From Swiss-Prot:
Entries under HAMAP family matching the protein: Ribosomal_uS9_B (MF_00532_B)
Protein name, entry field: Small ribosomal subunit protein uS9
Entries under InterPro entries matching the protein: Ribosomal_Su5_D2-typ_SF (IPR020568), Ribosomal_uS9 (IPR000754), Ribosomal_uS9_bac/plastid (IPR023035), Ribosomal_uS9_CS (IPR020574), Ribsml_uS5_D2-typ_fold_subgr (IPR014721)
Organism field: Vibrio campbellii (strain ATCC BAA-1116)
Keyword Chaperone on entry: no
One GO molecular-function entry: structural constituent of ribosome
PANTHER family linked to this entry: RIBOSOMAL PROTEIN S9, SMALL RIBOSOMAL SUBUNIT PROTEIN US9M
GO biological process: translation
Family membership: Belongs to the universal ribosomal protein uS9 family.
PROSITE patterns: RIBOSOMAL_S9
Keyword annotations: Ribonucleoprotein, Ribosomal protein
Length: 130
């Protein structure tokens, strides 16, 4: 690994992202595609950029990301978590700011399992009195 390269792993739902940060001009590459190309929805793009905008390093760092599993929303969340961890490795003094915004905490919510005798996790079959 390069000396001036920082790494962070992010997870959300069933997605996992590996994020590499290098000093640069603000390029974001996700699975060999640009941010705008990879995420069609503006909300997903916004989620990915949140930690960088918070610490005002959007134009100073290049990001190289590989992400697997899950859907669009889960992948965006995983990338955000990975960026946050990589930023803390880059500069530990950013931790309190990122913590206050709630980016350091891994969002543990995931899909609830389907139970036997039910149609979904909690949806019961229709009840008939007669």
């Amino acid at each position: 690994m390069a000396e001036n390269q920082y790494y962070g792993t992010g997870r959300r739902k069933s997605s996992a992202a590996r994020v590499f940060i290098k000093p640069g001009s603000g390029n974001i590459v996700i699975n060999k595609r640009s941010l705008d190309e990879y995420f069609g929805r503006p909300t997903s793009r916004m989620v990915v950029k949140q930690p960088l905008e918070l610490v005002e390093l959007t134009e100073k760092l290049d990001l190289y990301v590989t992400v697997k599993g899950g859907g669009i929303s889960g992948q965006a969340g995983a990338i955000r978590h990975g960026i946050t961890r990589a930023l803390m490795e880059y500069d530990e003094s950013l931790r309190p700011t990122l913590r206050a915004a709630g980016y350091v905490t891994r969002d543990a919510r995931c899909v609830e399992r389907k139970k036997v005798g039910l149609r979904k996790a909690r949806r019961r079959p229709q009840f008939s009195k007669r």
